[in-house]
Amino acid sequence: MNPINSFIFPDIPKDLGKILMKDDQQLIVVGIIGKSSTPDCNKLVGFNLLTIHPALTDTDPRDGRVKFYFENDGKILYLHFETTFDQHVMADLLAKAVQTGIQDNFINFNSTVRTRFARVLLFAIQVCHMIVLVEPSSVFDTSYLSIFKSLKIIREKYVLKFLPKLLKSSNLGNYMGKEARLCSPRFIFFFEGTSNIKPEDVEKLDGLECSVEEEIYKMLRNEFIITNNSAMSLFSIPRSKKFVFYNSDKRAKSNPLADSIDLLMKYLNKPAGGQNDDDEDLMSRLRPYDGYGMSAWSVGKSKRAEKKERSILALLKEHVAEAFEHGFDDSASKYRGRGHFVIPSFKTWYEGFKLLHKIFIDNPSNSSYETNDPDYKAFLQNFHKIIDIDERFFAEICEHGLELAMVNYKDMLPHHYSSTFHEKKYEQAHELFTRYARGPEVERHEQKLKDYCDSIWLNGKQQCEYPSLRGNPCALGKHKVKDPTEHSSGVIFVSACNCGRTQGHREDPYTIRQGNYDFYQIIAKSCSSCNVLERVKFPVFEPSSNDFRAAEFINKNLSNLMSFEHSNRTPDASTHPPMTNENSPHLSGSQKSQDSASNLTFSMDEKRDEENKSQKFGTQGEDEDETLEQETVNEIVIKVGEHSEDKAILRQPSTTEYLPGMLHAASPAGLLPQFPSWSLVCLGPSSIYTHNSGIPEHVQSGFLSGANFLLPWDVSVRLEHAQSWAASYEKIRNRKKNTSQPKSSESSNTFTLKIFLGVEYECLRGHRFIMSGPDTVLRGGSGSIVRDSGSKVVFNDMPIYFPCPCRSSNIAQLMRVHVVTPKAPVNVIVEPKVRILQGTTQNCLTFTTGLTEPIKLSQSAYWILRLPFIYEGDSGPLMPPAGVTVANAATHGVLMAGMFGIRESEISEELL
């Protein structure tokens, strides 16, 4: 029989059971727990107690396993606990967790390791008189403090409530008393780590142990793990004996196989000679255990002389001797004598041990176990929560970060806000949350933050966000509307009225009617001129009954529209007369009415060609007050044509269906909109405008400095058939001048007209300016005369959108065309066409006024044509572009060239 016996609970051999349970044998129970770094996980190696090194056995360690060790004639029962703090047990647990995917992060895994170790440690505290905490290193692991503190809380809050009841009901463990344990167990701290102190230097080792004892005692006292009353402490610390031991014997960490091979080689290499005491000692060290290769009789009779040496086993025996003699009472003098200490027989103790093992180890490991005792149930449910300080720490910092993030999100919230603002506020709150949150609870708290922010936004804070025709979202709360006009973005623009005299605030439009008609009707009430000025009426839908609706159609003319756009023609030649470029160097145009027509064309020629009867455009410059620089003068040939026999066949507009959008070149014939998007008013006589000072501020407000001048356009008109009205015109003209000087035939047929034009742009802040060309803003100095020619705007496409020269980098839109007609027996005609490009030049719409003929303006008058604020095609409104620059302005939309023309008028003396 080996000097020391062992077995693994609960498999106790019969022969060992008889030995332990004979004569009511009493034993001091010493628990061995802590950490180990060897594959066998046996922490008794450093005690020099084992006869066979654990490395030579084939037993695999397992979490929660308890192994009993005792000597036949000894008084100590060693309980060796294998826990998750043993390195190889932890490695096996980690391998299983990775394989099964149960633990998704290290924090959860570490929490599981700590919880399982704490269960075993609490169980050891209940069944042991002494506990040796083994540490492989030379430094105390302060992470034990949190486990000790948590176990003290668990014991006081739960264990002392349910355990006495369970022991009493089972008639087992009555010897444990009210404390439900043998005693307040003494803790011995055993450090296996080698220090720099040599084993021979005992004084330094003792000094190190004393200093470590003081530090450990202070830490345990500061955390209230031990108190003056040991009965109220988790465990006790001896007051007059050592409780810290540093192992200086290197054999505790030796590898027996490697050491045996080294010793064998050393013995074989030794020179031949007689055997001595050193050889005997060498041979004994080669044996795997004491007595190996010797007879049982010699082993029993030959006992080694016990040497007085420094060992952990000697220290334990001192404490055991005190336990048998007086028991442990480590309380202060005030509480001394009140502690509970009992040494039961092994049989009695073992029955209680089995019950406590089931309560503290087996039942918590069984996930399906249920108990009727509420205190025990609370213990099972809350054990992990209390022990797991890491998860609690990370949960608390996540909660703290979550609270700060919630406050940050709620701070200065508007009454309603958009999804973009919501996401921005959430990102700010989430950024603040991530400054604090750590650990496995981050994702769960992130979802809580997301749900919280979403709930606030969706519960009465959600903004409607329905976009306006200018792209601004509705600022009202989420609401259901019957009409788009119920939306409001809260954005206010500044715009002028139809005549341009009055500026006012306008709301961001949500319908074409709001943008192109309603605003101008409202502001007209504030304007002193709009409602009294002469105006041109544009065709609109006039229902014949109350039963009318918007037309539903598929734009079959879309392909025709694309082809006609590039040839500057309209699809319907009968309703829109084409502007064609003929072989003649002069541009010719046609005037149509229901009874007669006259052809009219414009052209610029560089050479005089008698065969083609062409004339070169002359350059003249004159003004009533000052002389302008020489500029190109355009010559217009007016031909008086014959009366047309056939009248144009015009389709009558529908009186039951209206056009839902705006009129454009491809709109179905016979459909008209419900309201006009254009406006043409006569501001008054031409004398309103003086070229020396520009447009007066009281007539047109909001113009930028130097950009309030119209451009002069000098046009030379030649009569090809003077007999129609030239004779009477000259007669009246000579009479006015009181002269009878005859003129040549050529000079009597040519007239020079001065027409003042202005293409006005207006930004959303109300800034207005005239442009002198497709890419140039007019810059007229104070007191000087603008010398730019109007021909640039007449014969070029003018962009609809252009960067405003103001500081705010707004986009200005072409909103008005100013025309000051001359005092001459001709009429200026206008036929505006706006081409809006949608992405490419192959996808565009040409918007028209809907009139079947060009508009004839009266002589010697100031006319203003107001263009639409919003454009809408058959598929819906066309959003104004963003990022307009001088270089790309013409790619978004243009007012097409060829808008202006000249027609003859009846001659009367009042015109001169």
From Swiss-Prot:
Residues in the signal sequence: none
Domain of life: Eukaryota
Stated name of the protein: Nonsense-mediated mRNA decay factor SMG8
Positions of region (Disordered): 565-630
Extent of Polar residues compositional bias: 570-602
Family: Belongs to the SMG8 family.
Naturally occurring in which organism (per UniProt): Culex quinquefasciatus (Southern house mosquito)
Record's keyword terms, sorted: Nonsense-mediated mRNA decay
